[in-house]
Amino acid sequence: MTAFEIPTVTTAEGSLSLGQSLFQGNCAACHGAAGEGGSVGGGEVAPSLNVATPTQIGEALRTGPGVMPKFGPEQLSEHEVSSLARYIVWLRDNGDPGGLGIGRVGPVAEGFVAWVIGLGLLFIVIRLTGTKT
């Protein structure tokens, strides 16, 4: 069992686009697309990342707490760890893109809600204006 050194995480040196790509490929399945946690084990196994500091993110990546896999320097370089931390901080600080937030899911869910309400109203109008035979 190899012990990894806690990386020095500097979000200013990280790449936001690389961080997003790494997050989607390695983290989103458990922590959720918005880093809210709860995708696995209701937040007990994969907690929300909203309060994690960049150093805590780097430490978690290297040590793999609980069932989380460890990402050593051969899997993620210091630059990649900083990029991941930058993206996670960006997720937390930039709120809900795409209008009114519905559980931080964004405009796809809003469009779905609009369709459901629109179709419901259309059904009511058809029902009220229709004739009985």
Give the predicted meaning of each segment.
Residues 20-24, 51, 55, 105-108:
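Sequence context surrounding c-type heme c attachment/ligation sites in exported
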Residues 1-5, 73-130:
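C-terminal capping alpha-helices of c-type cytochrome domains
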Residues 1, 34, 40-96:
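Extracytoplasmic electron-transfer domains, predominantly the class I c-type cytochrome c fold
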